[in-house]
Structures are given as C-alpha cells and as structure tokens.
C-alpha cells in the first residue's frame, strides 16, 4: 500500500512539473522573437494593428495564458455563434476553423499566426456588426451614407480595456428599430420553417357585405398572417373589414377596407420576401448606427413620410412626395442639418430640367411655361420675344429659368434648407391632390410636404414663444425671406421598407426605387446565407 502511495505522489509531482513546464513554454512562446515575427508577418497589411501591438510590447490579446486572454477568446467564439441571428456572413468568420487553429497552436510561430488570425477576424466581425457588411455607395451611388467607421486601434484598445461582455454587448445598433427587426426576423424564420404562408388568394375585388368562397380565401390569408382569429364565415363582415384596414395601414395602403389588387399584391408577398426586407433593414440600421440627434427629422422615402422627433418621441409627422423612380430624379439617401427656412422662395429651375424638359417645349411654343422668367449670364431678366429658342440646343442654351415668389410657385410658400451637393431640400407645393395618393413619387428629387407650415412652426418652437406669428410675419412680406434656426436640426433621408412604427408594430413598404433588391443581392454575394436558406430573392416593387 505504501508503494502505491509513493507512486501516486511521484506521479502527482511529475504531472505538476509538466503543467509548469507547459505554461513556461507558452509564456516563453508568446514573448519570443519567433512569436513577434510570425505576428508581424501575418499582420503585414494592417499597419494600425501592428502599431497597437508595438505600443503594447506585443502582449497577446488571445493566446496568452492569463485569464483575460482566455476570457476574450472564449467570449469571441461564443459571440461568433450569433452571426446568423444578425444576418451576418457566418462563413466569413468561420468560427469552427478559428477554434481548431486556436486549440492546435503550440509553437511560437503557430501562436503568432493564430493571434493575428483572431485579431483580423475580430476586427472584421466588429466592423460588420457595428457599421455594416457593405459599402453603401458601392451598391447604389444614390446611397450617400457617411458611416462613422471606427479605427482598428480604437477597436483593439477598447476591447483590451473592458470586459468582453461589455464590449460585444454595445457593438451592434442599440436602436429600438434594430431590436424589433431581430424579433421579426426570428418570427419569420419560424414561419418559414413551418411551411410559410402559402395560401390561395381571391381573384376579384372584395367589399364589406360580399359573400362567398372568395371571402373565405381572403379571411384565411389574413388569419395565417396574424390579422384575424380563426373563423369560417363566408361573409365580409365588420371584423374582416377591420382586419383588412389594419393590414392596409401596416403596408402603406389606403385603409378603405376594400380588398383590391394593391391589397392582394401585398398579402401575396411570401414570408421569404418579408424576411429579405428585414435582413436589408438590419444592414441599413448598421449604416446609421450613430446619434441621430436629440431633435431630428426622419424622411423615410418608401413610407412617403416626414417625421420630427424630440428626445425619442414623435412630435410631428406629415405626408410627403419624393422623386420619381427614374434616373437622376430618385431622391438620394444622406444625412445633413436643416440650417434655415426660406419663405416666399424663388424657384431657380435646375439646369437639367431647363434643358431636358422646358427647352424642347419652348422650341415648339415660345410661350410655353410663360410663368418662368428667362435669366441671362448677368442675372438680368430677358423678354421671351428677344429669344429664338430654336437657335439653341442643350449644349448652347445660355439662359436660366426662374419662377418668382407666388402661391403658384413650384416650391409653394416655404422651403427648408440643408445645403448639400444634390440641391435637395424640403418644400411646400401647390399640387396638394398628390398627397391623397398611395404612391407619391412625382418630384425631380426634392421632398414636398403636405403640412409645411405646421412643420415650420415645430422647427421654430425652441427659439420663439410664438412660432406661428414669426413664420406668418415672414410670409406676409411677400418677399423672399430667410429665417435661421438658432439650433440647426439634423435631417436624415432614409429608406426603410421594413420598420417599426411608434406603437412598436412592424410595417412593410414597397421597394419603390429597387434599392433594397440591389442591397439584398449584394448581401448574398457577401456571404449571408439567406438565399440558400430561404430560396427567394427580394423583388423590386413599386
């Protein structure tokens, strides 16, 4: 028995010796010249990462044997399991391969390579989940997002100075929109796994009071989509009408309770198509993962709406008209600052409109658009009788056109200025009937507001006790007047076909410009697996 005890003690001592030796070798490995050379070689194309390691005496983030390194690597591998949750390109990070390489590394050279590999994947993942997978302008030049990308050094320094949990928890967008979109994504994935919404739809327009099998088809479709409780009635009753109206409201349709082609078209969208919209919206949220401003304006182009928020609360909203879905007239996406308001504005007709639209018409009829003044290079008004329009073409026409202030001015009585390279602004319009339409894409790119006066009052509230009086006084002059905002207001022209409204309810809109379809295809090319998983592409609608 004593012999066995001796053998046991010797074995224990040897075991502890080998553990100590292994740890010593590991420590020596990460402090060796070989480790540094391997790390530097693997990071040779990332000068910022090299600078970080040099500043920290090449102390490893991942492969050290201290507890902090173990916590970082363990939490990072855990975090990579959530890539599909956020609709990120899972295979791009290849967590299984990373983990295998991490576990197999023994020599200084191997540890240096793994340290560099984990750092590279960490930086890629962090950037992707925080500020997006794609570069917006590479998908569509009209998406002009100035994304506040973080530097490599900032990522590495922050990650090294806080707990992994704290770092990763705050990485993805913290907005209400992003959180709700993740919930909707999960819901849609469950629906798809159960076979989707496949259901036969009616072939004819249905109204309240109608009776028959077509009504049953409509009812069943709305039951499957969660708008009605199970019911087998063949009558288009009040409950069905309210369900149709609710569906219409949440899909940007006139809530008239009549099920026609537009309503059937939206009901007919598959769960896969809706999921594609959500995936794109998640990427778009990552592009705008910055402070929108305590007081800011959101112009959602597919929703044809303009909203003013203050401290997270909606304080004003109005319908709008956006650019037509043709080249050079689509409204771009960007962020800026509303600096001032101009009442009784003069409309200086953009040169492209003058040459492409008005010049041909004036060549046929010199009095066409006679409400527009001809302006020469000296900014003097020239009588039309002095000009032979047929002497010129697009390249030689020397005049500009402008419309003087009036209630019939194309800009109405007020415009809201955020000076930008696209000459885009918000403005009034004399064409009020357009706001009654569902699809309101009729402008040359600028945004027309249904309630511009009320919008002006809200913008002026922080700087005057009587904003209405101040604004109306400027209007009453009949002359072009500039009213500056003492505190400029951020304005964001966004494009969301899937979003959450102020009640926390998911809404969907048509892809009026086809931008989401292009983004979805680009995401597929970047490696997200939605196409293979869900089998459908996002269709352009409009």
Residue ranges and their predicted role:
Residues 14-22:
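Bacterial N-terminal signal peptides
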Residues 29-147:
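Cationic-aromatic interfacial patches
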Residues 160-161:
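Post-signal-peptide, soluble extracytosolic/periplasmic N-terminal scaffold domains
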């Amino acid at each position: 028995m004593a012999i066995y005890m001796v053998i046991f003690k010797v074995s224990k001592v040897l075991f502890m010796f080998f553990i100590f030796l292994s740890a010593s070798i590991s420590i020596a490995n990460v402090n060796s010249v070989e480790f540094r050379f391997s790390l530097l070689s693997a990071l040779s194309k990332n000068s910022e990462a090299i600078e970080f390691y040099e500043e920290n005496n090449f102390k490893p983030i991942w492969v050290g044997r201290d507890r902090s390194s173990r916590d970082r690597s363990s939490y990072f591998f855990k975090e990579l399991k959530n890539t599909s949750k956020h609709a990120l390109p899972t295979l791009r990070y290849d967590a299984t391969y990373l983990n295998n390489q991490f576990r197999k590394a023994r020599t200084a050279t191997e540890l240096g390579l793994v340290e560099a590999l984990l750092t590279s994947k960490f930086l890629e993942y962090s950037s992707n989940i925080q500020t997006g997978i794609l570069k917006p302008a590479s998908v569509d030049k009209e998406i002009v997002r100035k994304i506040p990308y973080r530097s490599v050094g900032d990522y590495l320094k922050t990650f090294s100075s806080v707990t992994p949990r704290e770092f990763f928890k705050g990485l993805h967008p913290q907005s209400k929109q992003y959180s709700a979109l993740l919930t909707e994504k999960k819901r849609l994935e469950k629906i798809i796994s159960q076979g989707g919404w496949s259901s036969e739809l009616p072939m004819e327009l249905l109204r309240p009071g109608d009776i028959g099998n077509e009504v049953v088809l409509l009812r069943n479709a709305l039951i499957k989509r969660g708008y009605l409780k199970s019911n087998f009635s063949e009558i288009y009753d009040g409950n069905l009408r309210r369900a149709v109206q609710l569906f219409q409201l949440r899909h940007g349709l006139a809530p008239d309770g009549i099920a026609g082609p537009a309503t059937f078209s939206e009901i007919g969208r598959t769960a896969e198509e809706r999921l594609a919209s959500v995936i794109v919206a998640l990427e778009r949220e990552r592009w705008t993962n910055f402070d929108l401003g305590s007081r800011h304006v959101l112009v959602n182009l597919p929703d044809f709406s303009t909203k003013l928020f203050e401290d997270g609360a909606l304080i004003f909203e109005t319908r709008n008209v956006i650019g037509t879905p043709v080249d050079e007239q689509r409204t771009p996406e960007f962020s800026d600052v509303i600096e001032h308001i101009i009442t009784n504005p003069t409309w200086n007709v953009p040169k492209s409109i003058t040459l492409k639209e008005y010049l041909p018409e004036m060549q046929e009829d010199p009095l066409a658009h006679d409400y527009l003044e001809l302006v020469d290079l000296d900014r003097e008004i020239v009588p039309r009788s002095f000009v032979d329009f047929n002497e010129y073409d697009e390249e030689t026409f020397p005049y500009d056109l402008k419309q003087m202030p009036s209630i019939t001015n194309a800009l109405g009585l007020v415009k809201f200025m955020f000076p930008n390279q696209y000459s885009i602004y918000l403005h009034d319009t004399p064409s009020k009937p357009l706001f009654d339409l569902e699809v309101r894409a009729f402008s040359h790119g600028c945004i027309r507001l249904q309630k511009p006066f009320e919008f002006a009052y809200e913008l002026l509230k922080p700087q005057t006790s009587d904003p209405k009086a101040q604004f109306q006084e400027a209007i009453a002059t009949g002359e072009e007047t500039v009213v500056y905002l003492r505190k400029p207001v951020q304005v964001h022209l966004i494009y969301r076909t899937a979003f959450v409204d102020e009640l926390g309810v998911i809404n969907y809109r048509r892809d009026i410009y086809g931008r989401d379809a292009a983004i979805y295809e680009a995401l597929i090319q970047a490696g997200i697996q939605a196409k293979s998983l869900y089998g459908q592409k996002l269709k352009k609608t409009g």
